[in-house]
Amino acid sequence: MNASHRDYCAYMALPRGPDRERFIRERSDALPEYLEAATAGDAEACFLLGRAHDVGSAGGNDSPNEAVKWYRKAAELGNVFAQYNLGVIYEGGRGIEKDEVEAARWYRKAADEGLADAQRALGNLYYSGRGLEKDEVE
C-alpha cells in the first residue's frame, strides 16, 4: 500500500473538522510522495495534494489555484470528495472567481455518485435558483 492510499484512508476515517485539517498539516512531509503518485494518475494522491493546498500545508499558505488544479484532476479520475470540494470552492469563490454554474456541475457529479453533502448543496442551488434554473421540486 502506498503512502497516498494509506494516508487517504486515515484521513477519511477521521471525523470532519479540525482533526482532518491537523492530519493534512502534519503529513506535509509526504507531499513529494503524493506528487509522485498524483503525477502517475493516483486519484487519492491528487485529492490529498488538493487538500494540502486548500488548508495551507503545502508551503505554509493556502493556494486556491493549486487546490483547484489537484482537486480537478482527482475529480476527473472519479474522486467524489474532490468533486464536492470543487463545488464548494466555485460556489464560494474562495480564491478564484465565483461560478455557481460550475459549482452545480461538480455538485451534480458527486451527488450522482451518492455523496449526501453534494446532494444537499445541489438541492440548495436548485431551491435558490443559483447556478441552475430554480426548481423547488428537484
Give a label for each model feature:
Residues 1, 39-42, 55-57, 76-79, ...:
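Short helix-capping/linker turns of helical repeat alpha-solenoids
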Residues 1-52:
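N-terminal segments that cap or nucleate solenoid repeat domains
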Residues 3-4, 10-11, 30, 50, ...:
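Small-residue hotspots
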Residues 7-17, 48-55, 83-92, 121-128:
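Hydrophobic face of amphipathic alpha-helices that form TPR/SEL1-like repeat modules
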Residues 22-33, 60-70, 97-106, 133-138:
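Structural signature of tandem alpha-helical TPR/SEL1-like repeats
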Residues 35-37, 73-74, 109-110:
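Canonical positions in the second alpha-helix
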